[in-house]
Protein backbone atom coordinates (compact mmCIF):
# COMPACT_ATOMS: atom_id res chain seq x y z
CA UNK A 1 0.00 0.00 0.00
CA UNK A 2 1.39 3.41 -0.91
CA UNK A 3 1.81 6.27 1.56
CA UNK A 4 -1.18 8.32 0.37
CA UNK A 5 -3.56 5.37 0.60
CA UNK A 6 -2.26 4.19 3.97
CA UNK A 7 -2.30 7.55 5.75
CA UNK A 8 -3.97 10.29 3.75
CA UNK A 9 -3.96 12.71 6.70
CA UNK A 10 -0.19 12.75 7.18
CA UNK A 11 0.39 12.53 3.44
CA UNK A 12 -1.90 15.50 2.92
CA UNK A 13 -0.13 17.61 5.53
CA UNK A 14 3.26 16.83 3.97
CA UNK A 15 1.90 17.61 0.51
CA UNK A 16 0.53 20.93 1.74
CA UNK A 17 3.86 21.80 3.33
CA UNK A 18 5.63 21.00 0.08
CA UNK A 19 3.24 23.33 -1.72
CA UNK A 20 3.86 26.04 0.87
CA UNK A 21 7.62 25.76 0.42
CA UNK A 22 7.23 25.74 -3.37
CA UNK A 23 5.15 28.91 -3.52
CA UNK A 24 6.61 30.94 -0.64
CA UNK A 25 9.86 32.88 -0.41
CA UNK A 26 11.72 31.39 2.56
CA UNK A 27 13.74 34.03 4.43
CA UNK A 28 14.08 32.44 7.88
CA UNK A 29 17.84 32.61 8.40
CA UNK A 30 18.04 29.20 10.08
CA UNK A 31 16.32 27.36 7.23
CA UNK A 32 17.59 26.01 3.93
CA UNK A 33 16.69 23.43 1.28
CA UNK A 34 18.62 20.16 1.20
CA UNK A 35 19.68 18.35 -1.94
CA UNK A 36 17.87 15.25 -3.26
CA UNK A 37 20.89 13.18 -2.17
CA UNK A 38 20.62 14.42 1.41
CA UNK A 39 16.89 13.65 1.44
CA UNK A 40 17.53 10.18 0.02
CA UNK A 41 20.09 9.40 2.71
CA UNK A 42 17.78 10.63 5.44
CA UNK A 43 14.92 8.51 4.10
CA UNK A 44 17.06 5.39 3.75
CA UNK A 45 16.93 2.00 5.51
CA UNK A 46 19.47 3.29 8.01
CA UNK A 47 16.48 4.54 9.99
CA UNK A 48 15.88 0.87 10.92
CA UNK A 49 19.22 0.41 12.72
CA UNK A 50 20.24 0.86 16.35
CA UNK A 51 23.91 1.65 16.98
CA UNK A 52 24.63 2.82 20.52
CA UNK A 53 28.31 3.63 20.87
CA UNK A 54 30.90 4.77 18.35
CA UNK A 55 32.52 3.20 15.26
CA UNK A 56 34.29 -0.01 16.26
CA UNK A 57 32.75 0.09 19.74
CA UNK A 58 29.01 -0.59 19.43
CA UNK A 59 26.63 -2.21 21.90
CA UNK A 60 24.69 -3.92 19.09
CA UNK A 61 25.73 -6.22 16.26
CA UNK A 62 25.32 -5.64 12.56
CA UNK A 63 26.84 -2.17 12.50
CA UNK A 64 29.63 -2.69 9.98
CA UNK A 65 28.00 -0.44 7.37
CA UNK A 66 26.83 2.08 9.94
CA UNK A 67 30.48 2.41 10.96
CA UNK A 68 31.44 3.13 7.35
CA UNK A 69 28.88 5.92 7.12
CA UNK A 70 29.73 7.49 10.48
CA UNK A 71 33.47 7.38 9.77
CA UNK A 72 32.85 9.10 6.44
CA UNK A 73 30.91 11.84 8.21
CA UNK A 74 33.65 12.24 10.83
CA UNK A 75 36.45 12.37 8.27
CA UNK A 76 34.60 14.84 6.07
CA UNK A 77 33.79 17.13 8.99
CA UNK A 78 37.42 17.16 10.11
CA UNK A 79 38.64 17.85 6.58
CA UNK A 80 36.07 20.56 5.88
CA UNK A 81 36.84 22.59 9.00
CA UNK A 82 40.43 21.57 9.70
CA UNK A 83 39.52 19.94 13.01
CA UNK A 84 41.42 17.31 15.00
CA UNK A 85 38.25 15.68 16.37
CA UNK A 86 34.61 15.47 15.31
CA UNK A 87 31.49 13.96 16.83
CA UNK A 88 28.66 13.73 14.30
CA UNK A 89 26.04 12.14 16.57
CA UNK A 90 24.28 15.12 18.24
CA UNK A 91 20.61 15.15 17.34
CA UNK A 92 20.58 18.96 17.34
CA UNK A 93 22.68 22.03 17.99
CA UNK A 94 21.18 22.35 21.45
CA UNK A 95 22.28 18.82 22.32
CA UNK A 96 25.72 19.53 20.91
CA UNK A 97 25.89 22.49 23.29
CA UNK A 98 24.61 20.46 26.24
CA UNK A 99 27.20 17.74 25.69
CA UNK A 100 29.94 20.33 25.36
CA UNK A 101 29.02 22.05 28.61
CA UNK A 102 28.97 18.71 30.40
CA UNK A 103 32.35 17.76 28.97
CA UNK A 104 34.03 20.98 30.11
CA UNK A 105 32.06 22.28 33.10
CA UNK A 106 30.81 21.33 36.53
CA UNK A 107 27.35 22.34 37.74
CA UNK A 108 27.41 25.96 38.83
CA UNK A 109 30.52 26.94 36.88
CA UNK A 110 30.59 30.49 35.55
CA UNK A 111 30.18 31.06 31.81
CA UNK A 112 30.29 34.30 29.82
CA UNK A 113 28.15 34.33 26.67
CA UNK A 114 26.17 36.65 24.40
CA UNK A 115 22.87 37.99 25.71
CA UNK A 116 19.79 36.60 23.99
CA UNK A 117 18.29 40.02 23.25
CA UNK A 118 21.53 41.11 21.58
CA UNK A 119 21.73 38.04 19.35
CA UNK A 120 22.67 35.06 21.52
CA UNK A 121 20.84 31.74 21.78
CA UNK A 122 18.61 30.10 24.39
CA UNK A 123 21.35 27.56 25.13
CA UNK A 124 23.78 30.39 25.90
CA UNK A 125 22.40 30.76 29.39
CA UNK A 126 18.75 31.75 29.10
CA UNK A 127 16.97 31.08 32.41
CA UNK A 128 14.33 29.04 30.56
CA UNK A 129 17.04 26.75 29.13
CA UNK A 130 18.92 23.92 30.84
CA UNK A 131 22.06 26.00 30.31
CA UNK A 132 20.88 28.84 32.51
CA UNK A 133 19.59 26.41 35.12
CA UNK A 134 22.69 24.23 35.46
CA UNK A 135 25.44 26.83 35.08
CA UNK A 136 25.99 30.39 36.26
CA UNK A 137 25.86 32.46 33.08
CA UNK A 138 26.89 36.07 32.73
CA UNK A 139 26.22 37.92 29.49
CA UNK A 140 27.94 40.41 27.24
CA UNK A 141 25.97 42.51 24.79
CA UNK A 142 26.54 44.83 21.88
CA UNK A 143 27.86 48.36 21.92
CA UNK A 144 24.69 50.49 22.14
CA UNK A 145 26.02 52.96 19.58
CA UNK A 146 27.42 50.61 16.93
CA UNK A 147 25.30 47.53 17.73
CA UNK A 148 28.45 45.47 17.26
CA UNK A 149 30.58 43.40 19.60
CA UNK A 150 32.90 45.52 21.72
CA UNK A 151 35.87 43.25 22.43
CA UNK A 152 37.46 45.63 24.92
CA UNK A 153 34.26 45.64 26.95
CA UNK A 154 33.99 41.85 26.75
CA UNK A 155 37.55 41.60 28.04
CA UNK A 156 36.63 43.83 31.00
CA UNK A 157 33.62 41.65 31.78
CA UNK A 158 35.74 38.51 31.57
CA UNK A 159 38.21 40.02 34.04
CA UNK A 160 35.36 40.75 36.45
CA UNK A 161 33.53 37.43 36.06
CA UNK A 162 36.54 35.10 35.76
CA UNK A 163 34.48 32.50 33.88
CA UNK A 164 35.41 28.86 33.41
CA UNK A 165 34.23 29.17 29.80
CA UNK A 166 33.55 31.91 27.27
CA UNK A 167 31.00 31.24 24.53
CA UNK A 168 31.31 33.08 21.22
CA UNK A 169 28.66 32.82 18.55
CA UNK A 170 25.12 33.97 17.96
CA UNK A 171 21.74 33.22 16.45
CA UNK A 172 20.95 36.78 15.40
CA UNK A 173 24.15 38.76 14.80
CA UNK A 174 24.81 40.01 11.29
CA UNK A 175 28.48 40.92 11.59
CA UNK A 176 31.63 38.81 11.34
CA UNK A 177 32.94 37.59 14.69
CA UNK A 178 36.66 37.85 15.42
CA UNK A 179 37.46 34.53 17.07
CA UNK A 180 41.13 35.42 17.45
CA UNK A 181 40.15 38.24 19.80
CA UNK A 182 37.91 35.89 21.75
CA UNK A 183 40.84 33.46 22.08
CA UNK A 184 43.00 36.26 23.46
CA UNK A 185 40.31 37.18 25.99
CA UNK A 186 39.87 33.54 27.05
CA UNK A 187 43.61 33.09 27.48
CA UNK A 188 43.80 36.31 29.48
CA UNK A 189 41.41 34.94 32.12
CA UNK A 190 42.30 31.25 31.80
CA UNK A 191 38.94 30.19 30.34
CA UNK A 192 37.94 27.58 27.80
CA UNK A 193 36.70 29.05 24.53
CA UNK A 194 33.61 27.49 22.99
CA UNK A 195 32.29 28.74 19.67
CA UNK A 196 28.74 28.09 18.50
CA UNK A 197 28.94 28.62 14.73
CA UNK A 198 25.54 27.13 13.90
CA UNK A 199 24.47 29.99 11.67
CA UNK A 200 27.73 30.62 9.84
CA UNK A 201 29.10 27.07 9.41
CA UNK A 202 28.52 27.06 5.66
CA UNK A 203 30.28 30.40 5.28
CA UNK A 204 33.18 29.11 7.38
CA UNK A 205 33.36 25.94 5.29
CA UNK A 206 33.60 28.07 2.15
CA UNK A 207 36.35 30.27 3.59
CA UNK A 208 34.08 33.33 3.66
CA UNK A 209 34.05 33.82 7.43
CA UNK A 210 36.88 33.45 9.95
CA UNK A 211 37.22 29.78 10.94
CA UNK A 212 36.90 29.37 14.73
CA UNK A 213 38.47 25.90 14.81
CA UNK A 214 42.11 27.07 15.09
CA UNK A 215 41.20 29.35 18.01
CA UNK A 216 38.53 27.53 20.02
CA UNK A 217 38.91 24.59 22.36
CA UNK A 218 35.58 23.31 21.07
CA UNK A 219 33.19 24.33 18.29
CA UNK A 220 29.55 23.35 18.01
CA UNK A 221 27.25 23.76 15.06
CA UNK A 222 24.09 22.59 13.45
CA UNK A 223 24.33 20.85 10.10
CA UNK A 224 21.46 22.68 8.44
CA UNK A 225 21.26 26.48 8.04
CA UNK A 226 24.09 27.68 5.75
CA UNK A 227 25.73 24.23 5.73
CA UNK A 228 22.66 22.98 3.82
CA UNK A 229 22.46 19.57 5.46
CA UNK A 230 19.86 17.73 7.56
CA UNK A 231 18.64 19.07 10.87
CA UNK A 232 21.24 17.91 13.37
CA UNK A 233 24.32 18.82 15.38
CA UNK A 234 28.10 18.50 15.17
CA UNK A 235 30.95 19.00 17.64
CA UNK A 236 34.54 19.82 16.60
CA UNK A 237 37.40 20.05 19.07
CA UNK A 238 41.07 19.65 19.88
CA UNK A 239 41.93 15.95 20.00
CA UNK A 240 42.67 16.08 23.72
CA UNK A 241 39.00 16.77 24.48
CA UNK A 242 37.56 14.05 22.26
CA UNK A 243 37.11 11.35 24.89
CA UNK A 244 35.33 13.68 27.31
CA UNK A 245 33.02 14.97 24.58
CA UNK A 246 32.17 11.48 23.35
CA UNK A 247 31.31 10.34 26.87
CA UNK A 248 29.28 13.46 27.61
CA UNK A 249 27.14 12.86 24.52
CA UNK A 250 26.85 9.07 24.79
CA UNK A 251 25.97 7.75 27.27
CA UNK A 252 25.71 11.15 28.95
CA UNK A 253 22.70 12.71 27.26
CA UNK A 254 21.84 10.53 24.24
CA UNK A 255 21.30 6.88 23.49
CA UNK A 256 21.66 5.63 19.95
CA UNK A 257 22.43 8.08 17.15
CA UNK A 258 20.03 8.68 14.27
CA UNK A 259 21.98 6.74 11.66
CA UNK A 260 19.89 7.95 8.73
CA UNK A 261 20.60 11.54 9.79
CA UNK A 262 24.31 10.80 10.22
CA UNK A 263 24.27 9.49 6.64
CA UNK A 264 22.59 12.68 5.47
CA UNK A 265 25.23 14.69 7.35
CA UNK A 266 27.96 12.74 5.55
CA UNK A 267 26.38 13.53 2.19
CA UNK A 268 25.98 17.23 3.01
CA UNK A 269 29.55 17.48 4.27
CA UNK A 270 30.70 15.84 1.05
CA UNK A 271 28.75 18.45 -0.92
CA UNK A 272 30.34 21.24 1.11
CA UNK A 273 33.80 19.93 0.19
CA UNK A 274 33.11 20.52 -3.51
CA UNK A 275 34.35 23.73 -5.22
CA UNK A 276 30.76 24.57 -6.20
CA UNK A 277 29.85 25.04 -2.54
CA UNK A 278 32.14 28.06 -2.23
CA UNK A 279 30.41 29.60 -5.24
CA UNK A 280 27.06 28.93 -3.59
CA UNK A 281 28.17 30.49 -0.30
CA UNK A 282 29.46 33.58 -2.10
CA UNK A 283 26.07 33.93 -3.77
CA UNK A 284 24.44 33.85 -0.31
CA UNK A 285 26.52 36.87 0.66
CA UNK A 286 25.94 38.64 -2.65
CA UNK A 287 22.20 38.15 -2.33
CA UNK A 288 22.21 39.48 1.22
CA UNK A 289 24.07 42.62 0.16
CA UNK A 290 21.58 43.13 -2.65
CA UNK A 291 18.65 42.66 -0.27
CA UNK A 292 20.20 45.11 2.18
CA UNK A 293 20.42 47.69 -0.61
CA UNK A 294 16.68 47.27 -1.12
CA UNK A 295 15.95 47.84 2.56
CA UNK A 296 18.24 50.86 2.68
CA UNK A 297 15.94 52.69 0.27
CA UNK A 298 13.17 52.67 2.91
CA UNK A 299 13.65 55.44 5.52
CA UNK A 300 11.17 53.76 7.89
CA UNK A 301 13.28 50.59 8.26
CA UNK A 302 16.45 50.54 10.34
CA UNK A 303 19.05 47.84 9.81
CA UNK A 304 20.62 46.70 13.08
CA UNK A 305 24.36 47.57 13.05
CA UNK A 306 23.77 49.22 9.68
CA UNK A 307 23.92 46.09 7.55
CA UNK A 308 25.38 42.60 7.29
CA UNK A 309 28.63 40.68 6.80
CA UNK A 310 26.95 37.28 6.60
CA UNK A 311 23.72 35.61 5.47
CA UNK A 312 21.29 37.50 7.67
CA UNK A 313 20.17 40.96 8.69
CA UNK A 314 17.97 42.20 11.53
CA UNK A 315 15.49 44.96 10.78
CA UNK A 316 13.88 47.35 13.24
CA UNK A 317 10.32 47.76 11.90
CA UNK A 318 8.98 50.12 14.57
CA UNK A 319 9.46 53.12 12.28
CA UNK A 320 6.22 52.01 10.66
CA UNK A 321 4.38 51.92 13.98
CA UNK A 322 4.20 48.12 13.94
CA UNK A 323 5.95 45.30 15.79
CA UNK A 324 7.83 42.25 14.57
CA UNK A 325 4.97 39.82 15.11
CA UNK A 326 2.63 41.98 13.05
CA UNK A 327 5.14 42.15 10.20
CA UNK A 328 5.78 38.40 10.33
CA UNK A 329 2.04 37.72 10.04
CA UNK A 330 1.62 40.32 7.31
CA UNK A 331 4.43 38.86 5.22
CA UNK A 332 2.97 35.37 5.64
CA UNK A 333 -0.13 36.66 3.88
CA UNK A 334 1.88 37.67 0.80
CA UNK A 335 3.97 34.49 0.71
CA UNK A 336 7.17 35.71 2.35
CA UNK A 337 8.27 33.72 5.41
CA UNK A 338 10.31 35.50 8.08
CA UNK A 339 10.53 35.43 11.86
CA UNK A 340 9.93 38.11 14.43
CA UNK A 341 13.12 38.82 16.37
CA UNK A 342 14.25 40.81 19.35
CA UNK A 343 16.70 43.61 18.67
CA UNK A 344 19.26 45.33 20.93
CA UNK A 345 17.42 47.44 23.50
CA UNK A 346 14.21 45.50 22.87
CA UNK A 347 11.10 47.32 24.11
CA UNK A 348 8.31 45.01 22.94
CA UNK A 349 9.36 41.74 24.57
CA UNK A 350 10.00 38.33 22.98
CA UNK A 351 6.44 37.64 21.81
CA UNK A 352 5.87 40.85 19.88
CA UNK A 353 9.46 42.08 19.30
CA UNK A 354 10.60 45.23 17.53
CA UNK A 355 12.21 43.52 14.57
CA UNK A 356 12.33 40.74 12.05
CA UNK A 357 15.26 38.59 10.95
CA UNK A 358 15.77 37.66 7.31
CA UNK A 359 18.35 35.44 5.61
CA UNK A 360 19.27 34.49 2.06
CA UNK A 361 20.48 30.87 2.32
CA UNK A 362 17.25 29.20 1.16
CA UNK A 363 16.49 31.56 -1.72
CA UNK A 364 20.10 31.21 -2.89
CA UNK A 365 19.69 27.44 -2.97
CA UNK A 366 16.64 27.98 -5.16
CA UNK A 367 18.68 30.10 -7.56
CA UNK A 368 17.51 33.62 -6.78
CA UNK A 369 19.79 36.26 -8.28
CA UNK A 370 21.08 39.42 -6.63
CA UNK A 371 18.55 41.54 -8.54
CA UNK A 372 15.73 39.27 -7.42
CA UNK A 373 16.97 39.38 -3.83
CA UNK A 374 16.94 43.17 -3.91
CA UNK A 375 13.41 43.02 -5.26
CA UNK A 376 12.37 40.77 -2.36
CA UNK A 377 13.63 43.44 0.03
CA UNK A 378 11.61 46.05 -1.84
CA UNK A 379 8.51 43.85 -1.68
CA UNK A 380 8.88 43.55 2.10
CA UNK A 381 9.03 47.33 2.39
CA UNK A 382 6.06 47.73 0.08
CA UNK A 383 3.98 45.21 2.03
CA UNK A 384 4.59 46.97 5.33
CA UNK A 385 3.95 50.40 3.84
CA UNK A 386 0.71 49.23 2.18
CA UNK A 387 -0.42 46.88 4.94
CA UNK A 388 -3.94 48.31 4.95
CA UNK A 389 -4.34 48.17 1.16
CA UNK A 390 -5.58 44.68 0.26
CA UNK A 391 -5.40 45.12 -3.54
CA UNK A 392 -1.77 46.22 -3.18
CA UNK A 393 -1.01 43.20 -0.98
CA UNK A 394 -2.66 40.91 -3.51
CA UNK A 395 -0.44 42.36 -6.22
CA UNK A 396 2.67 41.79 -4.07
CA UNK A 397 1.58 38.18 -3.53
CA UNK A 398 1.25 37.69 -7.27
CA UNK A 399 4.80 38.94 -7.76
CA UNK A 400 6.00 36.53 -5.06
CA UNK A 401 4.30 33.67 -6.90
CA UNK A 402 5.97 34.73 -10.14
CA UNK A 403 9.40 34.78 -8.46
CA UNK A 404 8.97 31.33 -6.91
CA UNK A 405 7.70 29.92 -10.21
CA UNK A 406 11.01 30.92 -11.82
CA UNK A 407 12.90 28.90 -9.21
CA UNK A 408 11.17 25.59 -8.40
CA UNK A 409 12.35 23.63 -5.37
CA UNK A 410 13.68 20.82 -7.56
UniProtKB/Swiss-Prot annotation:
State its role. Answer: Catalyzes the reversible interconversion of serine and glycine with tetrahydrofolate (THF) serving as the one-carbon carrier. This reaction serves as the major source of one-carbon groups required for the biosynthesis of purines, thymidylate, methionine, and other important biomolecules. Also exhibits THF-independent aldolase activity toward beta-hydroxyamino acids, producing glycine and aldehydes, via a retro-aldol mechanism.
Q: What is this protein called?
A: Serine hydroxymethyltransferase
Q: Which cofactor does it need?
A: pyridoxal 5'-phosphate
**Entry's NCBIfam families?**
PRK00011.1
Q: Its pathway?
A: One-carbon metabolism; tetrahydrofolate interconversion; Amino-acid biosynthesis; glycine biosynthesis; glycine from L-serine: step 1/1
Matching entries from SUPFAM superfamilies are given as: PLP-dependent transferases
EC identifiers of the protein: 2.1.2.1
Q: CDD domains, from UniProt?
A: SHMT
Q: Which family does it belong to?
A: Belongs to the SHMT family.
Q: Where does the chain bind (6S)-5,6,7,8-tetrahydrofolate?
A: 116, 120-122
Q: Which GO terms describe its biological process?
A: glycine biosynthetic process from serine; tetrahydrofolate interconversion
Which enzyme class, named as a word?
transferase
InterPro entries in alphabetical order: PyrdxlP-dep_Trfase (IPR015424), PyrdxlP-dep_Trfase_major (IPR015421), PyrdxlP-dep_Trfase_small (IPR015422), Ser_HO-MeTrfase (IPR001085), Ser_HO-MeTrfase-like (IPR049943), Ser_HO-MeTrfase_PLP_BS (IPR019798), SHMT-like_dom (IPR039429)
Location in or out of the cell? Cytoplasm
The residues annotated as site (Plays an important role in substrate specificity) are: 224
Q: Which reaction does it catalyse?
A: (6R)-5,10-methylene-5,6,7,8-tetrahydrofolate + glycine + H2O = (6S)-5,6,7,8-tetrahydrofolate + L-serine
Quaternary assembly: Homodimer.
A cellular component term, taken from the record's GO annotations: cytosol
Q: Output one GO MF annotation.
A: glycine hydroxymethyltransferase activity
